[in-house]
Amino acid sequence: MKVLGIAGYSGSGKTTLIEKIIPLLVRDGLRVSLIKHAHHAFEVDYPGKDSWRHRQAGCTEVLVSSAQRWALMHELRGAPEPTLQEQLARLGPCDLVIVEGWKFDPIPRIEVHRSGTDARRPLLYPGDPHVIAVATDEPLDTRLPQFGLDDAAAVAQFIRAFVAGREARARPAAAAD
């Protein structure tokens, strides 16, 4: 299982890019999973539903299952938030895990940069040695591979090479130092 982060500031286009590349990777036969980090509380069920009521009553875990999908909700109840590595261990077998968020964990990542949104914020690269490529709407002065924010096909091709272990060949020769 390969792990690849998609990192950038809020509003840079991470989710949109991920939505575009997943179907291309799946079409080529890759089994893709995703972990998204939320900086805020979130709900996956609704107040008043049985599963919500069971959680409110004190269950640590509630698993909801149907013929289409299942979801496991785990209440931390004051316990520390699990690390990315702990969350990765919970996933089933797959070829690629895309990680949205956890931008400071030591995993290879593609940085997503939008000039208007991120103009006053520093790029993660070159300060982040885990950035292996950049998807951007403006040319950047970097030796890393660069892709247009709208060029999902090129990003997907780079990711396929990464999954196949050919990431070094997917990068320009000058960037292999």
Language model: regions and residue ranges:
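Conserved lysine of the Walker
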Residues: 14
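N-terminal phosphate/diphosphate-binding loop that engages ATP/GTP or pyrophosphate donors
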Residues: 22-82
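The conserved Walker
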Residues: 10
